[in-house]
């Protein structure tokens, strides 16, 4: 039976299209990555970038590229990958196309926890991703408790997410009021962006991106099983509740890692899986990796536009994504209500 299913998959003409989409996506990701590194207020070229890679130092271009742009672009790529995977997983687990770490309050929980460390315990900034993960899990548990009624109800999930986000946003506002002398470094972080990103941020988020990419191969099979329904999934040997817990934990970890380095970025996990679902379909074997690829592309492009469009003024990426994502979210919400 396994051999037959593999044979069918090979013969399926859609698999060629899906593989082509991912291959072209990888090429586009590499191209966008390098182009973004040389674009900015200071003029640099591909030859300057090449000199950085071969170790030519002691030039102004080297300092700009190595210490500012390269770590910033890499951080944006990793954050985009993590948020897109997290959003795709949450949409699959909850069977809700509106699920996104930023919309349903997971990012807000991670943000409050991260902000507590950055303001009150700045000497422990290396612990920010772990603490943010704890905050994300707390938010997720509260969300499940509020939205559960013989299963997750989509409308209740959105309403509960708004309430959870408001609660944790209130906590962040309280921190800003009581520690107003220490918030200067966190204001831009709350708006969401990569200004000031360094190699420290790259090393902070990279391990979690690796975990996410490894988790993609495991998660895709589990998510495909869950789409068949609980009874069918159980008959196939899937431990449904344990699977849901594992997947939600993985999504919370990835969202928290992105929040810890980029702040409150919303809609990445909503937009990318939707766009890729239109292209590659609902098979998570293709949907998850393609979402990861194009999530990285989206945030690299968004960051590049945000820092260059109104130069020398830099628009926070979170603001830029909100202008794109909010209308898209309202469109999906309206379409979902019309179907009901």
Predicted feature descriptions by range:
Residues 1-340:
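Alpha-helical transmembrane segments in inner-membrane proteins
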């Amino acid at each position: 039976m396994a051999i037959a299913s593999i044979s069918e998959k090979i013969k399926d003409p859609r698999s060629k299209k899906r593989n082509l989409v991912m291959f072209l996506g990888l090429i586009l990701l590499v191209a966008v990555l390098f182009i973004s590194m040389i674009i900015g207020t200071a003029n640099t070229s591909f030859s300057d970038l090449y000199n950085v890679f071969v170790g030519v130092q002691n030039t102004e271009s080297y300092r700009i590229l190595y210490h500012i742009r390269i770590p910033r672009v890499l951080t944006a790529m990793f954050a985009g990958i993590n948020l897109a995977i997290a959003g795709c997983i949450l949409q699959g687990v909850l069977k809700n196309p509106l699920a996104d770490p930023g919309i349903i309050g997971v990012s807000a929980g991670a943000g409050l926890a991260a902000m507590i460390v950055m303001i009150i315990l700045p000497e422990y900034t290396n612990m920010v991703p772990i603490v943010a993960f704890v905050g994300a899990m707390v938010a997720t548990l509260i969300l499940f408790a509020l939205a559960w009624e013989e299963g997750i109800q989509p409308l209740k999930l959105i309403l509960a997410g708004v309430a959870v986000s408001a609660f944790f946003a209130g906590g962040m506002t309280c921190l800003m009021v009581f520690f107003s002398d220490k918030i200067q470094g966190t204001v831009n972080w709350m708006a969401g962006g990569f200004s000031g990103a360094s190699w420290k941020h790259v090393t902070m988020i990279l391990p979690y991106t690796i975990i996410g990419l490894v988790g993609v191969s495991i998660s895709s099979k589990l998510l495909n099983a869950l789409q068949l329904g609980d009874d069918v999934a159980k008959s196939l040997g899937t431990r449904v509740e344990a699977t849901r817990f594992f997947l939600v934990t993985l999504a919370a970890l990835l969202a928290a890692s992105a929040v810890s380095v980029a702040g409150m970025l919303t809609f990445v996990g909503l937009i990318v899986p939707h766009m890729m679902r239109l292209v590659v379909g609902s098979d998570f074997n293709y949907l998850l990796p393609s979402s990861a690829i194009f999530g990285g592309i989206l945030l690299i492009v968004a960051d590049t536009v945000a820092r260059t469009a109104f130069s020398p003024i830099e628009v926070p990426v979170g603001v830029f994504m909100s202008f794109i994502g909010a209308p898209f979210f309202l469109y999906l919400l309206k379409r979902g209500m019309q179907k009901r």
